[in-house]
Every structure is written in structure tokens, then in C-alpha cells.
Amino acid sequence: MKFIDEALIRVEAGDGGNGCVSFRREKYIPKGGPDGGDGGDGGDVYLIADENLNTLIDYRFEKRYAAGRGENGRSAGCTGHRGNDITLRVPVGTRAIDNDTQEVIGDLTKHGMKMLVAKGGYHGLGNTRFKSSVNRAPRQKTNGTPGEKRDLLLELMLLADVGMLGLPNAGKSTFIRAVSAAKPKVADYPFTTLVPSLGVARVGADRSFVVADIPGLIEGAADGAGLGIRFLKHLERCRVLIHLVDIMPIDESDPAQNISVIESELYQYSEKLSEKPTWLVFNKIDTIGEEEAQARAQEIAEQIGWEGDYYLISAATGQNVQNLTRDIMDFIEANPREVAEENTEADEVKFKWDDYHQQAMQNPIEEDWDNFDDDWSEEDEEGVEFVYTRS
């Protein structure tokens, strides 16, 4: 299935139903009083995280999603039905953004987590609500309010512990294949990897971490060169970044310069992302021998002013790969992910007597029924009363 990590959709919550103006009419009860019911609340629109999904492709074709409108109130004090809610299923890791204001509404980072993205309109009040000792036959009501409407940008951000950085053909996909059961495409030409992929690296019987591979960056990626930097967002939730460097590039480019290019593009994209813990890993040491690789790696580290440790591996042959994965696992266990307490339940619907209805009671809509005769009276000119008889 095609990997789609962005989609723009329109969500429309349902309008609230209008209140009803009605009076009770029954045999032998000539002055029954008001019995108009309230309208129903409009339906809400929710997003829910589903671990069985891994792409937003469904939302590329159907763009509009509308919840049900609340029904109008009816006579006999009947309240209108609430509008039907709709729930849209998205992959775990999806972020919802209001496309007009760029407000981040929330992140769905756990399976089953539910989020309200468009609130339904409030119900209108029927004339029964306006009955009082001085207003015994009220003809006032209120209308329901419109539901919330939004242009919603959905962004899928992969949830991984480790993120891979590097130029095209640095060996990132080969490394993923070496440490996990994932099988991303590997070839000897640039941009073999076109979409992000995940792999689960197992260290021993009961220890594992998730590693994310993204398409390689090139100089000018922040300005749109190559595949740009659109996939860097998938690294935002990683705990550590692995900067994989070809120690002896086939194009004879300078590895130190290549490292500077990646660091520059990363900083231009996000200063926060560039401050994440980053490990320097020199790959393809099997092409030049370990002793020469040691000397060359030390020289490169001095050129770029690298102060921390670095690793030398060969993803193709597996040389030193186990030591690297073991150290990554130890680092991840020593630095657990900071998880804020997140409510997996959606916001509850407010009680119907909220501030809106308190204000609406002050400015009701008056029904103008010039010919409406709510009760029979002896003062009527004809003095006629209808009597129902069974035939």
C-alpha cells in the first residue's frame, strides 16, 4: 500500500436542533399549557488511533466528513434526537492541526486514544423552558447553534526510538536490514529509499527498540532539493539519532563535509531536532580495512571537532553491528521516553444547562402567530366549543 503521511480534510460537526413552540391539546384539557420540547445536540467529529493502520491514504480520496444534525424539538415535550457522531480512524502517531490557524489540536500516540476535533452545536430550547407565573402561554424558543467546521491537516509521524540520518547511499537501509527483520530496498544508486520505513531491532530474548529509516538528505534539502526535508518530521519523536557516514564515498567526496551538510540541513529544519542526542557511526569499513578506517575516522572527527565517541561498522558484513545495537539498547533503557499523562477518552459533552443556554434564555425568538388561539374562551364571539364524539 502506498505510504501517505499527510492529508487535508474538512470536518463538519452537526448543527443543534431548534426548540419547538407547541401547546398541549387534549380532550377535556382546554388549557394544557406549553409542551414544546428542546432540540437535540449536533453530532461531534472524533479521531481515534488504530494500530492496524499505517498510512493516511484513505483521506486522500474522501475529503469531507460531516456529523449528523440534531433533530428539532417536538410537541408533547419530546426532545429531538442527538445528531450521530462520526469517528475517523487514523494511524497511531497522527497529529491533527487546524489548517487555518496552524493550531496543533493534539497527537494520537497510543492505540485507542480518542480526540474531539469538531464540537457539535448546542440544542435550542422549546417554549416549555420559558413558562412562568407571568408567562403562562409562552411563544418563545431558541434555535440550535451551528456545529464547528474545520479544515484539518493530518500528519503521520512515525513512533520510533532511533532515527537514521545520512546522505543517500550511506548504508541506512542496509543497517536496518542487518539489525531487524525489515527488508527495505537496497541498491547502488541514490534515493533508493523513497518513503520512511520502520524496523524492530532485537537485542537478546526480551529487549528491542524501533528504528526509523528516512530518505537521504542532500545539500539544499531545506530549500526543496532532492526529496526535501518533509520526512524529517518522522524523527521528532526519536530518542536518539544515528548519523551514518560513508567512510570512503565512491564519489570521492569529503566525509567531513558530508557530515557538515547533514548537520546544517537538520538545524535549518528544526533547532530542537538538531539538539537531540546524536551518535556518529562510520559505515563501510570493510572497503578499506579496519586499521585504515580507524585512522581515517579519527582524522574526520578532528576535522569536524567531534568530542564524543564514534563507532566503526560494516552494515553489509555485520562487523561491529552487535556492539552498536547493544549500546543503543542500553542508552534507550537509561533514558526512558518522557510520556505526559494523556487521557485516552474524548472530552465529555457539556451539561445542557451551560453558559450558552443561560444567555439564550435572555434573548429568545418570539413566534408570531396572529391567528393562533391557544385556549377556548367564553369571550369568543361565536361561543362555540368543539366536542369530539365517537361515531
From Swiss-Prot:
The keyword Ubl conjugation does not apply. Its cofactor is Mg(2+). Residues 1-159 form the Obg domain. Its EC number is 3.6.5.-. It is found in: Cytoplasm. The keyword GTP-binding applies. It is an enzyme of class 3 (hydrolase). GO terms for molecular function: GTP binding; GTPase activity; magnesium ion binding. InterPro entries: G_OBG, GTP-bd, GTP-bd_Obg/CgtA, GTP1-OBG_CS, GTP1_OBG_dom, GTP1_OBG_dom_sf, OBG_GTPase, P-loop_NTPase. Keywords: Cytoplasm, GTP-binding, Hydrolase, Magnesium, Metal-binding, Nucleotide-binding. PROSITE patterns: G_OBG, GTP1_OBG, OBG. It holds the Pfam family GTP1_OBG. GTP binds at residues 166-173, 191-195, 213-216, 283-286, 314-316. GO terms for biological process: ribosome biogenesis. An essential GTPase which binds GTP, GDP and possibly (p)ppGpp with moderate affinity, with high nucleotide exchange rates and a fairly low GTP hydrolysis rate. Plays a role in control of the cell cycle, stress response, ribosome biogenesis and in those bacteria that undergo differentiation, in morphogenesis control. Monomer. NCBIfam families: Obg_CgtA, PRK12297.1, PRK12299.1. Belongs to the TRAFAC class OBG-HflX-like GTPase superfamily. OBG GTPase family. This is GTPase Obg. It comes from Actinobacillus pleuropneumoniae serotype 5b (strain L20). The gene is obg.
